[in-house]
Amino acid sequence: MSASPPSFLHSLKRLSLVTQIVIGLIAGIALALLAPEVAKSTTFIGKVFVSALKAVAPILVFVLVMASIANHKHGQETHIRPILVLYLLGTFAAAVVAVIASSLFPSALVLSTHDVAISAPGGITEVLQSLLLSVVDNPVSALMNANFIGILAWAIGMGVAIRHAGETTRTVLDDLSNGVTVIVRVVIRFAPLGIFGLVASTLATSGFNALLGYLHLLAVLIGCMLFVALVMNPLIVFWKIRRNPFPLVLTCLRESGITAFFTRSSAANIPVNLELSKRLGLHEDTYSVSIPLGATINMAGAAITITVLTLAAVHTLGIAVDLPTAVLLSVVAAICACGASGVAGGSLLLIPLACSLFGIPSEIAMQVVAVGFIIGVLQDSAETALNSSTDVLFTAAACMAQEDKAQAA
């Protein structure tokens, strides 16, 4: 009998993170149904998880962005410029789609705003002024106060400067980036417990209407991703190759998207995309560079996640959003998305940066991140499927357009 608990814990540990999150979600719902008073006491578990996310997010953004820029190879983009343009265009278009969808179908979240001062910006002018002041903030102050705009600015500046440093310095920075990533993975491993506490306490306190709110949010997210995959991306591909894009689009979704949906990792799907590119007869020197690069910067799904969840928080808090600010959010979301690769829940951890545009404090932004983890079982799978399938789709479109141009000449 004494061996049973360790055996059970060992079996639970061997399950995938997705399965553990589902178990945490179901357990939280069950506890809220069967023992609401006990469920309310699990608030502390959720608070610890959210606090851990708040702790790692600033240093994560700073180190990852700085290391990414510092280790970027000179001249790499010259071989794949048309594909790079498609990657950036597709990511920005996805953010715009998310802004429009969030305006048409606004989502409301259950957020705790007690003892938190919220100062909504008055318009694009005030947003830009605040943005500029955030950019020139002291780097130590930016890290301490989770000023993500300031963190991003200093990370970009330091990354550009360190590009001219010695190889040893850049290697150390890359190792530091890997170290931070390991810490983030440890925090993410506690997501099932954190989600259990958040779901149980939220449902016990706010009732099951909160869960219905998550379903609406998930529908908006998945709807945006389907629209981008089946409407926006085909339009971009048609603009590039000037013929029916759907055979290529459906092939990429079937051969790459389905695999990525279940692996939930763009990096893990790189071999699948390389093999598909080879079968499509694409130029090896092109796809061998563009596919790994796409897994890093082609993040349409991440742009949708960042935008929809940020605007859900904005709508919940009653903050008005004018058109110029919405456009600025699309740009920021696209830039943030490019830095979301390689980290579990990367797009969710960059939501506070987008929220800071609207004067939403880190305490509330991290509650939005926690909501993202609750719906992440489906959201992250759909996001990865869109991201990874689009890598090979845009690579194929650019190669086909180049071949057509060469034949015409």
Swiss-Prot record:
UniProt keyword annotation of Membrane present: yes
Transmembrane segments: 15-35, 49-69, 82-102, 142-162, 193-213, 218-238, 301-321, 331-351, 357-377
UniProt membrane topology term: Multi-pass membrane protein
Key word Transport present: yes
GO BP, sorted A to Z: serine transport; threonine transport
Recorded family membership: Belongs to the dicarboxylate/amino acid:cation symporter (DAACS) (TC 2.A.23) family.
Function: Involved in the import of serine and threonine into the cell, with the concomitant import of sodium (symport system).
Protein name listed in UniProt: Serine/threonine transporter SstT
Organism: Pseudomonas fluorescens (strain ATCC BAA-477 / NRRL B-23932 / Pf-5)
